[in-house]
């Protein structure tokens, strides 16, 4: 076989609200992990919302054509080359690789081969992307209809026909002892407690999903996030959605601003501070006069040294005005005392 023969895909959520994806081969003697990703719970929903999947859809179209043609080693190698890189685009492509492996195995052993799941993957994935966008905008964003509960927002989204799926059913669930510091294909049941401790390998009981289809994977994640509920906000700086991991009132994400080493959250704090300051009339008057005096330097009617000295005194008087030690009228009069006619 070209594909690993005994592939498995699993998903679980940790106690720290991290989502874990793994695609691995269970074949004895050649066990390998092909995808292992741990990230903040709900990040894959954000990625469904933000990512341009045009190139991926083109690859899926090519995969469908190959699956419907005569199967030979060259075709399976091409399918492997096309499908495996998709896992780096989004972890939801992992179940597709697993299904292609299962399909090749059926052909190799002259078993009934049903390509329906593979052939429907592109349409299912496209529906998932659309559903995820409505889920984020209308259900998980708690600032949309804030007087509604998550369940009520979900019901309204259904009534408005924005969600693509009528239910949240999913595949096989199992509670397992997961090795937190070992490869995905390995199992704690192969080792004694003493040996695991000696090797420094931690384990934990987790509810693990083994999806039969990508719909199973999405439905489980969707249901999990709705039950919590998982809050998602739109960043007030870049306008993109992000998962709220701390303070529920967060307004800014942690993405780097374009062309900057600062994040939206770091810059957002500055913007908030400036906004609060500008609400004070003394600060507004200082800013107005500061700009006017700075313009004089550019026009050559004031030296830099004079501007620096003026700025130092102006800041001191502004602070005194804000503290109530100087009246606003006296402060404005001082600012305008050297006004040029």
Positions of PLM-derived features:
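Short helix-coil boundary/hinge micro-motifs
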Residues: 1-242, 273-277, 281-296, 304, ...
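Cysteine-rich micro-motifs
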Residues: 247-267
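Short loop/turn segments at secondary-structure transitions that flank enzyme active sites
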Residues: 241, 259, 270
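Short linear motifs in low-complexity, proline-biased tails and propeptides
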Residues: 323-329
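Extracellular/mature segments of secreted proteins
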Residues: 261-262, 272-274
């Amino acid at each position: 076989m070209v594909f690993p023969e005994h592939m498995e895909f699993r998903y679980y959520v940790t106690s720290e609200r991290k989502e874990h994806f793994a695609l691995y081969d269970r074949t004895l003697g050649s066990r390998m992990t092909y995808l292992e990703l741990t990230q903040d719970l709900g990040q894959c929903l954000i990625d469904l919302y933000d990512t341009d999947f045009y190139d991926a859809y083109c690859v899926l179209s090519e995969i469908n054509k190959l699956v419907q043609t005569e199967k030979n080693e060259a075709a399976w190698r091409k399918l492997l080359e096309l499908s495996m890189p998709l896992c780096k685009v989004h972890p939801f492509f992992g179940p597709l690789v697993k299904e292609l492996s299962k399909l090749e195995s059926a052909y190799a052993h002259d078993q009934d081969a049903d390509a329906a799941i593979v052939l429907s993957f592109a349409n299912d994935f496209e529906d998932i992307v659309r559903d995820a966008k409505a889920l984020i905008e209308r259900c998980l964003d708690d600032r949309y209809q804030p007087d509604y509960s998550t369940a009520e927002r979900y019901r309204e989204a259904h009534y408005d026909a924005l969600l693509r799926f009528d239910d949240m059913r999913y595949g096989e669930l199992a509670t397992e002892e997961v090795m937190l510091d070992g490869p995905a294909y390995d199992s704690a049941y192969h080792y004694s407690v003493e040996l695991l401790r000696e090797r420094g390998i931690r384990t934990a009981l987790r509810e693990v999903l083994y999806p039969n289809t990508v719909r199973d994977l999405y439905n489980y994640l969707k249901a999990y996030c709705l039950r919590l509920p998982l809050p998602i906000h739109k960043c007030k700086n870049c306008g993109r959605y992000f998962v709220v991991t701390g303070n529920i009132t967060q307004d800014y994400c942690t993405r780097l601003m374009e062309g900057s080493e600062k994040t939206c959250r770091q810059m957002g704090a500055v913007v908030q501070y400036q906004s609060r300051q500008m609400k004070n009339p003394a600060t507004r008057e200082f800013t107005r006069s500061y700009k006017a005096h700075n313009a004089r330097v550019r026009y050559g009617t004031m030296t830099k040294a004079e501007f620096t000295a003026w700025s130092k005194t102006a800041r001191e008087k502004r602070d005194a005005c804000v503290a109530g030690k100087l009246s606003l009228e006296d402060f404005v009069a001082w600012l305008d005392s050297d006004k040029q006619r």
